[in-house]
Amino acid sequence: MLIVQKYGGTSMGSIERIHNVAQRVLESVKLGHQVVVVVSAMSGETDRLLEFGKNFSHNPNKREMDRIVSAGEWISSAALSMALERYGHRAISLSGKEAGILTSSHFQNAVIQSIDTQRITELLEKNYIVVIAGFQGADIQGETTTLGRGGSDLSAVALAGALKAHLCEIYTDVDGVYTTDPRIEEKAQKIAQISYDEMLELASMGAKVLLNRSVELAKKLSVKLVTRNSFNHSEGTLIVAEKDFKGERMETPIVSGIALDKNQARVSMEGVEDRPGIAAEIFGALAEYRINVDMIVQTIGRDGKTDLDFTIVKTQIEETKQALKPFLAQMDSIDYDENIAKVSIVGVGMKSHSGVASIAFKALAKDNINIMMISTSEIKISVLIDIKYAELAVRTLHAVYQLDQ
Protein backbone atom coordinates (compact mmCIF):
# COMPACT_ATOMS: atom_id res chain seq x y z
CA MET A 1 0.00 0.00 0.00
CA LEU A 2 1.38 3.41 -1.00
CA ILE A 3 1.15 6.25 1.50
CA VAL A 4 2.16 9.89 1.08
CA GLN A 5 3.25 11.55 4.32
CA LYS A 6 3.77 15.28 4.72
CA TYR A 7 5.71 16.76 7.66
CA GLY A 8 5.48 20.47 8.41
CA GLY A 9 8.05 22.94 9.65
CA THR A 10 7.42 22.29 13.34
CA SER A 11 7.76 18.53 12.84
CA MET A 12 11.07 19.20 11.05
CA GLY A 13 12.09 21.99 13.42
CA SER A 14 15.36 20.60 14.80
CA ILE A 15 17.95 17.86 14.27
CA GLU A 16 16.28 15.77 16.97
CA ARG A 17 12.86 16.21 15.38
CA ILE A 18 14.14 15.22 11.95
CA HIS A 19 15.45 12.00 13.51
CA ASN A 20 12.00 11.49 15.08
CA VAL A 21 10.35 11.96 11.68
CA ALA A 22 12.71 9.36 10.21
CA GLN A 23 11.62 6.88 12.87
CA ARG A 24 7.96 7.68 12.17
CA VAL A 25 8.43 7.06 8.45
CA LEU A 26 10.18 3.76 9.14
CA GLU A 27 7.24 2.62 11.29
CA SER A 28 5.07 2.78 8.17
CA VAL A 29 7.69 0.99 6.10
CA LYS A 30 7.86 -1.82 8.67
CA LEU A 31 4.09 -2.26 8.23
CA GLY A 32 4.74 -3.06 4.58
CA HIS A 33 3.88 0.31 3.06
CA GLN A 34 5.69 2.14 0.29
CA VAL A 35 6.22 5.70 1.49
CA VAL A 36 6.68 9.01 -0.30
CA VAL A 37 7.51 11.83 2.12
CA VAL A 38 6.92 15.53 1.46
CA VAL A 39 8.65 17.98 3.80
CA SER A 40 8.48 21.66 4.59
CA ALA A 41 11.47 23.78 5.52
CA MET A 42 12.53 23.69 9.15
CA SER A 43 10.41 25.92 11.38
CA GLY A 44 11.28 29.61 10.83
CA GLU A 45 13.57 28.92 7.88
CA THR A 46 11.25 30.27 5.19
CA ASP A 47 10.85 33.57 7.05
CA ARG A 48 14.61 33.74 7.57
CA LEU A 49 15.26 33.22 3.86
CA LEU A 50 12.65 35.83 2.92
CA GLU A 51 14.30 38.40 5.18
CA PHE A 52 17.71 37.40 3.83
CA GLY A 53 16.57 38.10 0.28
CA LYS A 54 15.13 41.49 1.22
CA ASN A 55 18.61 42.64 2.27
CA PHE A 56 19.53 42.97 -1.40
CA SER A 57 16.48 44.75 -2.81
CA HIS A 58 13.59 46.88 -1.59
CA ASN A 59 11.45 45.25 -4.29
CA PRO A 60 12.92 41.73 -4.67
CA ASN A 61 12.69 39.96 -8.00
CA LYS A 62 10.14 37.16 -7.55
CA ARG A 63 12.11 34.67 -9.65
CA GLU A 64 15.23 35.15 -7.55
CA MET A 65 13.26 35.03 -4.30
CA ASP A 66 11.77 31.68 -5.31
CA ARG A 67 15.27 30.31 -5.81
CA ILE A 68 16.32 31.56 -2.37
CA VAL A 69 13.22 30.46 -0.47
CA SER A 70 13.00 27.00 -2.05
CA ALA A 71 16.41 26.16 -0.56
CA GLY A 72 14.75 25.61 2.82
CA GLU A 73 12.89 22.54 1.58
CA TRP A 74 15.95 21.24 -0.28
CA ILE A 75 17.89 21.25 2.98
CA SER A 76 15.19 19.54 5.05
CA SER A 77 14.53 16.86 2.41
CA ALA A 78 18.23 16.04 2.12
CA ALA A 79 18.60 15.94 5.91
CA LEU A 80 15.69 13.53 6.32
CA SER A 81 16.99 11.34 3.52
CA MET A 82 20.36 11.06 5.25
CA ALA A 83 18.68 10.28 8.58
CA LEU A 84 16.68 7.46 6.96
CA GLU A 85 19.83 5.99 5.46
CA ARG A 86 21.54 6.19 8.84
CA TYR A 87 18.77 3.95 10.19
CA GLY A 88 19.39 1.41 7.47
CA HIS A 89 16.89 2.15 4.71
CA ARG A 90 17.56 3.36 1.17
CA ALA A 91 16.31 6.91 0.72
CA ILE A 92 16.73 9.72 -1.77
CA SER A 93 15.73 13.38 -1.75
CA LEU A 94 14.24 15.12 -4.79
CA SER A 95 13.49 18.76 -5.46
CA GLY A 96 10.04 19.59 -6.79
CA LYS A 97 11.49 19.80 -10.29
CA GLU A 98 13.26 16.44 -9.94
CA ALA A 99 9.99 14.91 -8.71
CA GLY A 100 8.31 15.93 -11.97
CA ILE A 101 6.06 18.67 -10.56
CA LEU A 102 5.20 21.01 -13.46
CA THR A 103 3.73 24.38 -12.50
CA SER A 104 2.60 27.65 -14.02
CA SER A 105 5.13 30.49 -14.23
CA HIS A 106 3.57 32.59 -11.45
CA PHE A 107 6.57 32.98 -9.17
CA GLN A 108 5.76 32.85 -5.43
CA ASN A 109 2.20 31.63 -6.11
CA ALA A 110 2.45 29.01 -8.85
CA VAL A 111 -0.25 26.47 -9.71
CA ILE A 112 0.53 22.77 -10.18
CA GLN A 113 -0.38 21.77 -13.74
CA SER A 114 0.74 18.13 -13.87
CA ILE A 115 3.09 15.61 -12.27
CA ASP A 116 5.26 13.13 -14.13
CA THR A 117 5.54 10.28 -11.62
CA GLN A 118 7.92 8.08 -13.62
CA ARG A 119 11.06 8.80 -11.58
CA ILE A 120 9.25 8.44 -8.25
CA THR A 121 7.67 5.15 -9.33
CA GLU A 122 11.01 3.76 -10.48
CA LEU A 123 12.62 4.66 -7.16
CA LEU A 124 9.77 3.07 -5.18
CA GLU A 125 10.18 -0.12 -7.20
CA LYS A 126 13.85 -0.14 -6.16
CA ASN A 127 12.75 0.01 -2.50
CA TYR A 128 13.68 3.65 -1.90
CA ILE A 129 11.86 5.96 0.47
CA VAL A 130 11.42 9.05 -1.71
CA VAL A 131 11.70 12.36 0.17
CA ILE A 132 10.41 15.32 -1.83
CA ALA A 133 10.91 19.02 -1.16
CA GLY A 134 7.42 20.47 -0.74
CA PHE A 135 6.18 23.94 -1.65
CA GLN A 136 7.87 23.97 -5.06
CA GLY A 137 8.06 22.78 -8.65
CA ALA A 138 9.28 24.08 -11.99
CA ASP A 139 7.57 25.69 -14.98
CA ILE A 140 7.83 24.58 -18.61
CA GLN A 141 11.13 26.48 -18.95
CA GLY A 142 12.58 24.60 -15.98
CA GLU A 143 12.50 27.68 -13.72
CA THR A 144 12.06 26.96 -10.01
CA THR A 145 8.69 28.16 -8.70
CA THR A 146 7.03 28.11 -5.28
CA LEU A 147 3.37 27.41 -4.55
CA GLY A 148 2.70 30.06 -1.94
CA ARG A 149 2.66 29.84 1.83
CA GLY A 150 1.54 26.39 2.99
CA GLY A 151 2.22 24.91 -0.42
CA SER A 152 3.78 21.74 0.98
CA ASP A 153 0.28 20.47 1.79
CA LEU A 154 -0.63 21.06 -1.84
CA SER A 155 2.48 19.20 -3.00
CA ALA A 156 1.54 16.20 -0.85
CA VAL A 157 -2.07 16.03 -2.02
CA ALA A 158 -1.13 16.47 -5.68
CA LEU A 159 1.48 13.70 -5.41
CA ALA A 160 -0.99 11.42 -3.62
CA GLY A 161 -3.47 11.93 -6.43
CA ALA A 162 -0.93 11.44 -9.20
CA LEU A 163 0.51 8.30 -7.56
CA LYS A 164 -2.97 6.98 -6.68
CA ALA A 165 -1.87 6.62 -3.06
CA HIS A 166 -4.16 4.87 -0.60
CA LEU A 167 -3.80 7.68 1.91
CA CYS A 168 -2.26 11.12 2.36
CA GLU A 169 -1.17 11.78 5.94
CA ILE A 170 -0.58 15.40 6.97
CA TYR A 171 1.59 15.59 10.11
CA THR A 172 1.56 18.79 12.18
CA ASP A 173 1.96 19.73 15.85
CA VAL A 174 -1.73 19.17 16.71
CA ASP A 175 -3.73 15.96 17.08
CA GLY A 176 -6.10 16.67 14.19
CA VAL A 177 -8.91 19.06 13.28
CA TYR A 178 -10.58 20.69 16.27
CA THR A 179 -13.85 22.52 16.74
CA THR A 180 -11.66 25.61 17.05
CA ASP A 181 -8.02 26.43 17.74
CA PRO A 182 -7.13 24.73 21.07
CA ARG A 183 -4.62 27.50 21.75
CA ILE A 184 -7.56 29.93 21.93
CA GLU A 185 -10.21 27.71 23.52
CA GLU A 186 -8.92 24.95 25.80
CA LYS A 187 -12.31 23.20 25.65
CA ALA A 188 -12.02 22.64 21.89
CA GLN A 189 -12.85 19.06 20.87
CA LYS A 190 -11.08 16.95 18.26
CA ILE A 191 -13.26 16.01 15.30
CA ALA A 192 -12.94 12.31 14.37
CA GLN A 193 -14.08 12.76 10.77
CA ILE A 194 -15.19 15.68 8.68
CA SER A 195 -16.34 16.18 5.10
CA TYR A 196 -14.28 17.85 2.40
CA ASP A 197 -16.86 20.66 2.23
CA GLU A 198 -16.73 21.42 5.95
CA MET A 199 -12.94 21.20 6.01
CA LEU A 200 -12.74 23.44 2.96
CA GLU A 201 -14.77 26.12 4.68
CA LEU A 202 -12.70 25.85 7.88
CA ALA A 203 -9.45 25.97 5.90
CA SER A 204 -10.50 28.88 3.70
CA MET A 205 -11.77 30.79 6.74
CA GLY A 206 -8.52 30.59 8.66
CA ALA A 207 -8.23 27.14 10.28
CA LYS A 208 -4.48 26.43 10.40
CA VAL A 209 -4.42 22.64 10.02
CA LEU A 210 -4.74 22.53 6.22
CA LEU A 211 -4.37 24.92 3.32
CA ASN A 212 -7.70 25.42 1.54
CA ARG A 213 -6.13 24.81 -1.88
CA SER A 214 -5.01 21.38 -0.71
CA VAL A 215 -8.52 20.50 0.50
CA GLU A 216 -10.00 21.60 -2.83
CA LEU A 217 -7.51 19.42 -4.67
CA ALA A 218 -8.10 16.46 -2.35
CA LYS A 219 -11.82 16.68 -3.06
CA LYS A 220 -11.24 16.95 -6.81
CA LEU A 221 -8.86 13.97 -6.87
CA SER A 222 -10.76 11.97 -4.19
CA VAL A 223 -7.61 11.79 -2.05
CA LYS A 224 -8.32 10.43 1.42
CA LEU A 225 -6.69 12.75 3.98
CA VAL A 226 -5.73 12.17 7.59
CA THR A 227 -4.26 14.91 9.77
CA ARG A 228 -2.11 13.65 12.63
CA ASN A 229 0.31 14.82 15.30
CA SER A 230 3.91 13.94 14.53
CA PHE A 231 4.72 13.96 18.26
CA ASN A 232 2.28 11.23 19.34
CA HIS A 233 0.25 8.37 17.89
CA SER A 234 -3.29 9.73 18.21
CA GLU A 235 -5.83 8.73 15.56
CA GLY A 236 -6.10 12.20 14.05
CA THR A 237 -8.96 13.40 11.84
CA LEU A 238 -10.17 11.68 8.69
CA ILE A 239 -11.20 14.01 5.85
CA VAL A 240 -13.26 12.38 3.10
CA ALA A 241 -16.51 12.70 1.16
CA GLU A 242 -19.54 12.31 3.44
CA LYS A 243 -20.44 9.04 1.73
CA ASP A 244 -17.08 7.59 2.82
CA PHE A 245 -17.46 8.27 6.55
CA LYS A 246 -16.51 5.30 8.70
CA GLY A 247 -19.52 3.89 10.56
CA GLU A 248 -22.82 5.69 11.00
CA ARG A 249 -22.84 9.36 11.92
CA MET A 250 -25.53 10.52 14.30
CA GLU A 251 -27.63 13.47 13.14
CA THR A 252 -25.29 16.04 11.63
CA PRO A 253 -24.39 18.77 14.16
CA ILE A 254 -25.64 22.24 13.26
CA VAL A 255 -22.18 23.77 13.68
CA SER A 256 -18.95 21.79 13.29
CA GLY A 257 -16.37 24.43 14.07
CA ILE A 258 -15.34 28.06 14.57
CA ALA A 259 -12.45 29.45 12.52
CA LEU A 260 -10.41 32.61 13.06
CA ASP A 261 -8.42 34.45 10.41
CA LYS A 262 -6.27 37.38 11.52
CA ASN A 263 -4.50 37.66 8.17
CA GLN A 264 -7.18 39.96 6.74
CA ALA A 265 -7.27 43.60 5.70
CA ARG A 266 -10.28 45.75 4.90
CA VAL A 267 -10.17 48.05 1.88
CA SER A 268 -12.63 50.96 2.06
CA MET A 269 -13.20 52.99 -1.11
CA GLU A 270 -15.38 56.05 -0.55
CA GLY A 271 -17.04 58.19 -3.17
CA VAL A 272 -16.51 55.84 -6.10
CA GLU A 273 -18.12 56.92 -9.38
CA ASP A 274 -21.45 55.09 -9.55
CA ARG A 275 -21.65 53.95 -13.17
CA PRO A 276 -22.26 50.63 -14.94
CA GLY A 277 -19.12 48.51 -15.12
CA ILE A 278 -17.04 50.24 -12.44
CA ALA A 279 -17.15 47.23 -10.10
CA ALA A 280 -16.17 44.90 -12.95
CA GLU A 281 -13.22 47.15 -13.77
CA ILE A 282 -12.02 47.34 -10.16
CA PHE A 283 -12.30 43.63 -9.40
CA GLY A 284 -10.96 42.76 -12.83
CA ALA A 285 -7.81 44.77 -12.06
CA LEU A 286 -7.46 42.98 -8.72
CA ALA A 287 -7.85 39.62 -10.46
CA GLU A 288 -5.00 40.48 -12.84
CA TYR A 289 -2.76 40.85 -9.79
CA ARG A 290 -4.07 37.48 -8.48
CA ILE A 291 -5.54 39.17 -5.41
CA ASN A 292 -8.13 37.11 -3.54
CA VAL A 293 -11.12 39.26 -2.63
CA ASP A 294 -13.45 37.87 0.01
CA MET A 295 -16.22 39.84 1.73
CA ILE A 296 -17.76 42.64 -0.36
CA VAL A 297 -20.20 45.36 0.71
CA GLN A 298 -21.44 48.14 -1.57
CA THR A 299 -23.32 51.09 -0.12
CA ILE A 300 -25.31 53.28 -2.47
CA GLY A 301 -24.40 56.91 -1.88
CA ARG A 302 -25.61 60.18 -3.33
CA ASP A 303 -24.70 62.46 -6.19
CA GLY A 304 -23.71 59.60 -8.48
CA LYS A 305 -21.24 58.08 -6.02
CA THR A 306 -21.06 54.87 -3.99
CA ASP A 307 -18.91 53.34 -1.25
CA LEU A 308 -17.24 49.97 -1.76
CA ASP A 309 -15.69 47.86 1.02
CA PHE A 310 -14.01 44.48 0.62
CA THR A 311 -11.48 42.27 2.37
CA ILE A 312 -8.19 40.85 1.12
CA VAL A 313 -5.32 38.83 2.53
CA LYS A 314 -3.16 41.19 4.58
CA THR A 315 0.02 40.16 2.75
CA GLN A 316 -1.45 41.41 -0.55
CA ILE A 317 -1.90 45.05 0.45
CA GLU A 318 0.98 46.34 -1.69
CA GLU A 319 -0.26 44.46 -4.77
CA THR A 320 -3.75 45.83 -4.10
CA LYS A 321 -2.44 49.39 -3.99
CA GLN A 322 -0.75 48.86 -7.35
CA ALA A 323 -3.90 47.36 -8.88
CA LEU A 324 -6.08 50.23 -7.69
CA LYS A 325 -3.78 53.09 -8.74
CA PRO A 326 -5.66 53.71 -12.02
CA PHE A 327 -8.91 54.22 -10.09
CA LEU A 328 -7.74 56.77 -7.51
CA ALA A 329 -9.00 59.69 -9.61
CA GLN A 330 -12.45 58.07 -9.71
CA MET A 331 -13.00 58.08 -5.93
CA ASP A 332 -12.83 60.47 -2.99
CA SER A 333 -10.61 58.37 -0.72
CA ILE A 334 -9.30 54.89 0.00
CA ASP A 335 -8.30 53.37 3.32
CA TYR A 336 -6.60 50.12 4.36
CA ASP A 337 -7.41 48.67 7.80
CA GLU A 338 -5.21 45.83 9.05
CA ASN A 339 -6.66 45.79 12.58
CA ILE A 340 -9.51 43.44 11.75
CA ALA A 341 -10.21 39.72 11.98
CA LYS A 342 -12.68 37.34 10.39
CA VAL A 343 -14.51 34.81 12.55
CA SER A 344 -16.44 32.05 10.78
CA ILE A 345 -19.08 29.54 11.89
CA VAL A 346 -19.07 26.34 9.80
CA GLY A 347 -21.40 23.34 9.61
CA VAL A 348 -23.36 21.36 7.03
CA GLY A 349 -26.21 21.17 9.55
CA MET A 350 -26.84 24.88 8.98
CA LYS A 351 -28.55 23.98 5.69
CA SER A 352 -31.58 22.60 7.51
CA HIS A 353 -31.74 24.85 10.57
CA SER A 354 -32.97 28.43 10.87
CA GLY A 355 -31.83 31.03 13.38
CA VAL A 356 -28.14 30.06 13.38
CA ALA A 357 -27.02 33.59 12.47
CA SER A 358 -29.32 35.18 15.03
CA ILE A 359 -27.74 33.11 17.82
CA ALA A 360 -24.27 34.32 16.80
CA PHE A 361 -25.22 37.98 16.47
CA LYS A 362 -26.95 38.04 19.87
CA ALA A 363 -23.97 36.36 21.56
CA LEU A 364 -21.49 38.82 20.06
CA ALA A 365 -23.69 41.80 20.94
CA LYS A 366 -23.84 40.60 24.55
CA ASP A 367 -20.03 40.86 24.63
CA ASN A 368 -20.17 44.33 23.02
CA ILE A 369 -18.46 43.08 19.86
CA ASN A 370 -19.41 45.18 16.84
CA ILE A 371 -19.84 43.44 13.48
CA MET A 372 -18.39 45.42 10.55
CA MET A 373 -19.22 43.07 7.67
CA ILE A 374 -21.10 39.80 7.18
CA SER A 375 -20.91 37.11 4.51
CA THR A 376 -22.72 33.78 4.26
CA SER A 377 -22.79 30.58 2.24
CA GLU A 378 -24.83 27.40 2.56
CA ILE A 379 -22.63 26.02 5.33
CA LYS A 380 -20.87 29.04 6.86
CA ILE A 381 -21.38 32.51 8.32
CA SER A 382 -18.44 34.93 8.57
CA VAL A 383 -18.25 38.20 10.47
CA LEU A 384 -15.58 40.88 10.35
CA ILE A 385 -14.70 42.41 13.72
CA ASP A 386 -12.02 44.47 15.46
CA ILE A 387 -8.95 42.26 15.89
CA LYS A 388 -8.73 43.03 19.62
CA TYR A 389 -11.97 41.07 20.15
CA ALA A 390 -11.00 38.14 17.90
CA GLU A 391 -10.22 35.50 20.53
CA LEU A 392 -13.11 36.54 22.76
CA ALA A 393 -15.47 36.13 19.80
CA VAL A 394 -14.15 32.63 19.10
CA ARG A 395 -14.66 31.53 22.71
CA THR A 396 -18.12 33.08 22.84
CA LEU A 397 -19.33 31.38 19.67
CA HIS A 398 -17.72 28.06 20.61
CA ALA A 399 -19.70 28.11 23.86
CA VAL A 400 -23.02 29.32 22.47
CA TYR A 401 -23.09 26.48 19.92
CA GLN A 402 -22.08 24.00 22.66
CA LEU A 403 -19.01 22.79 20.79
CA ASP A 404 -17.21 22.21 24.08
CA GLN A 405 -19.48 19.26 24.90
Swiss-Prot record:
Alphabetical GO biological process terms: diaminopimelate biosynthetic process; homoserine biosynthetic process; lysine biosynthetic process via diaminopimelate; threonine biosynthetic process
Assigned EC number: 2.7.2.4
One example GO MF annotation: ATP binding
CDD domains: AAK_AKii-LysC-BS, ACT_AK-LysC-DapG-like_2, ACT_AKii-LysC-BS-like_1
GO cellular component: cytosol
Disulfide bond sites: none
Catalytic activity: L-aspartate + ATP = 4-phospho-L-aspartate + ADP
A Pfam match: ACT
Keywords: Amino-acid biosynthesis, ATP-binding, Diaminopimelate biosynthesis, Kinase, Lysine biosynthesis, Nucleotide-binding, Repeat, Transferase
Keyword set includes Magnesium: no
UniProt pathway annotation: Amino-acid biosynthesis; L-lysine biosynthesis via DAP pathway; (S)-tetrahydrodipicolinate from L-aspartate: step 1/4; Amino-acid biosynthesis; L-methionine biosynthesis via de novo pathway; L-homoserine from L-aspartate: step 1/3; Amino-acid biosynthesis; L-threonine biosynthesis; L-threonine from L-aspartate: step 1/5
Name this protein carries in UniProt: Aspartokinase
Organism this protein belongs to: Helicobacter pylori (strain J99 / ATCC 700824)
Species lineage: Bacteria, Pseudomonadati, Campylobacterota, Epsilonproteobacteria, Campylobacterales
